[in-house]
Amino acid sequence: MAKTPTRARKRVKKQVSDGIAHVHASFNNTIVTITDRQGNALSWATSGGSGFRGSRKSTPFAAQVAAERAGEIAKEYGVKNLEVMVKGPGPGRESSIRALNAAGFRITNITDVTPIPHNGCRPPKKRRV
C-alpha cells in the first residue's frame, strides 16, 4: 500500500522593517545575529562560517564578511533599520558595524552590552609571548 506524498508547504517569510543586530566579538571569532524587535533570529553569520579559519578568523575583515552575509539574508525579510548591540572586546567590533552600514541599513542606535563583572570570576593569566 503506497502512501500518498504529503506536500511541504512553502514557508512565507514575514516582513520586518526594524531589527536588532547582535555583534558578539570575541578574541577568536565574531558572531553577527540579526533579530526582530522581539529577539527572534532572522539571520546569522560567523567569521568561521564565512570561510576563515585559524588566526584569520579573528580579523576585522572576517567580521566584515560575516556582517555582510548576515545582512544579505536579513534584507530578504525587509529589514531596513537596525539597532546594533555590540558585546565583547574583539577586533571585529567596529568593522562589522561599518559593514552593516555599507550594506544599506540605517543604523539607529549603537549600544555596548559587554558584560562587566562586579569582581566575579578570576580572569585568565596574562600571556607570555
Curated annotation (Swiss-Prot):
Pfam families: Ribosomal_S11. Keywords: Ribonucleoprotein, Ribosomal protein, RNA-binding, rRNA-binding. Coiled coil: none annotated. Part of the 30S ribosomal subunit. Interacts with proteins S7 and S18. Binds to IF-3. Located on the platform of the 30S subunit, it bridges several disparate RNA helices of the 16S rRNA. Forms part of the Shine-Dalgarno cleft in the 70S ribosome. Belongs to the universal ribosomal protein uS11 family. This is Small ribosomal subunit protein uS11. The lineage of its organism: Bacteria, Pseudomonadati, Pseudomonadota, Gammaproteobacteria, Aeromonadales.
